[in-house]
């Protein structure tokens, strides 16, 4: 094990000098012992003359020139496998939940090659989430990538938790949650909500919060991804949640200038597309299993042409847009059915009936949107009979898109519902074809399948 010494410290970037014949490789982990604290550095560049430039995975406070640095001769390695379930870990895979050692049987390096072309699975299989609006309007593909766009308080976290719960219970799948540059409070809330919903033993949590140095936030997504890859290679369907993918990019921006790179557009790192690609290309399905990822996306200043969200868009198969307008109507999940899209919504993938139903629902809701102004000024009576029918059906559809969640039982008091895709299509098709025109619209609010709406109408 070669030993070097620190020659320069600039914020999170540390230069270390090694003997010429023992220079560490790029991405190797180095270790500094400073008092009783151990700090891990990751090699980013070889500057020549035995000097390497590294990023610190923790705070570089208290480092000084001349401190000895050991080369671990391998990249950062983290625990993988079932031992990680129900635990909270940091970027290095160390437990931060005060529950003792992880007790893992295996450790994997966080830098891995994406699966080769031959290993990739080409089947376009749908992942049934049991959430009506998602299954109908923006279906997820097994091994697909989903962007969850939404402001504060419209339900990103609750939607994520419901997805984790449904995958865990209905599909006996595992989930990995990577909190990248998250608020510590949110991470804490999330952990306790997972415990209360009894799904903690099906999910591994990896956190690198906002207060951590950029090196930590830049690598924590890879730590979570590595754990997900292990489950995939065991033949499982895994869900990988990344919250927030924008902060992964931001961490790269923070260290880029310190590493001596010229900034590109809007001050982002010149390697933006490549860094995003390295992460996203590993999130994929192979012939053994699949990784389906749900990524929360923050859009700076609501500008979708900003380089960061624009680069993210290129990789997504589906976008789920949460709308404050819909949330204010009391309709949860507050997914906007007209704004959310999916590459899977294609008759060749989902079948003609599903496609026609989804497009029919969209056209009715779109027509209702256009008629709203007329209704606001002149009232319902001025509409033609045909338009009155469209409005009545649109309002039923709007309410039928809501659904009680299992993870929200605590505060809604309504038992959660999982709705199969078959029942979802049957329900919306029936409303569109006028089979339920005689039922009052409140019968459709917060129910599971259409049969429940019919039962509810009898009690009203």
Swiss-Prot record:
Concerning CDD domains, the annotation shows:
ATP-synt_F1_beta_C, ATP-synt_F1_beta_N, F1-ATPase_beta_CD
What EC designation does it have? 7.1.2.2
- Superkingdom in the source lineage: Bacteria
Q: What PROSITE patterns does this protein map onto?
A: ATPASE_ALPHA_BETA (PS00152)
Q: What's its membrane topology?
A: Peripheral membrane protein
Cellular location(s)? Cell inner membrane
What does the record give as the reaction this protein catalyses? ATP + H2O + 4 H(+)(in) = ADP + phosphate + 5 H(+)(out)
Question: What name does the UniProt record give this protein?
Answer: ATP synthase subunit beta
Report the gene name.
atpD
């Amino acid at each position: 094990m070669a030993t070097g010494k620190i020659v320069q410290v600039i914020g999170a970037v540390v230069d270390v000098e090694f003997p010429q014949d023992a220079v560490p490789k790029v991405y190797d982990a180095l270790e500094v012992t400073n008092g009783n604290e151990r700090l891990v550095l990751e090699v980013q560049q070889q500057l020549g003359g035995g000097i390497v430039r590294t990023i610190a995975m923790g705070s570089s406070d208290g480092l000084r020139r001349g401190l000895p640095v050991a080369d671990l001769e391998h990249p950062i390695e983290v625990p993988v496998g079932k031992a990680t379930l129900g635990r909270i870990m940091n970027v290095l895979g160390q437990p931060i939940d005060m529950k003792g050692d992880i007790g893992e049987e295996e450790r994997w390096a966080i830098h891995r090659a994406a699966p080769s072309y031959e290993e990739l699975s080409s089947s376009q299989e749908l992942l049934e989430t049991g959430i009506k609006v998602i299954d109908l309007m923006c279906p997820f593909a097994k091994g697909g990538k989903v962007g969850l766009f939404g402001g504060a308080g419209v339900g990103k976290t609750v939607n994520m938790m419901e997805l984790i719960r449904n995958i865990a219970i209905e599909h006996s799948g595992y989930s990995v949650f990577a909190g990248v540059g998250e608020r510590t409070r949110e991470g804490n809330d999330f952990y306790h909500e997972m415990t209360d919903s009894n799904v903690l033993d099906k999910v591994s949590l990896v956190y690198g919060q906002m207060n951590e140095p950029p090196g930590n936030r830049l690598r924590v997504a890879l730590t979570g991804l590595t754990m997900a890859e292990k489950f995939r290679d065991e033949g499982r369907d895994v869900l990988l949640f990344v919250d927030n993918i924008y902060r992964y990019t931001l961490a790269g921006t923070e260290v880029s200038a310190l590493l001596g790179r010229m900034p590109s557009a809007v001050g982002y790192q010149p390697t933006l597309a490549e860094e995003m690609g390295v992460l996203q290309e590993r999130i994929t399905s192979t012939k053994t299993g699949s990784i389906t990822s749900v990524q929360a996306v923050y859009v700076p200043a609501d500008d979708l042409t900003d380089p960061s969200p624009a680069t993210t868009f290129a990789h997504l198969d589906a976008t789920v847009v949460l709308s404050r307008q819909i949330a204010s109507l009391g309709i949860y999940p507050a997914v906007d059915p007209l704004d959310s899209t999916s590459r899977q919504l294609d008759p060749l993938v989902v079948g003609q009936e599903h496609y026609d139903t989804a497009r029919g629902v969209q056209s009715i809701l779109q027509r209702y949107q256009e008629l709203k102004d007329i209704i606001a000024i002149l009232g319902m009576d001025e509409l033609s009979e045909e338009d009155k029918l469209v409005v009545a059906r649109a309002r039923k559809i709007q309410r039928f898109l809501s659904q009680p969640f299992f993870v929200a039982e605590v505060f809604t008091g309504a038992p959660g519902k999982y709705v199969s895709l078959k029942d979802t299509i049957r329900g919306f098709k029936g409303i569109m074809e006028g089979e339920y025109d005689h039922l009052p619209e409140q019968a459709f609010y917060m129910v599971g399948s259409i049969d429940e709406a019919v039962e509810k109408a009898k009690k009203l």
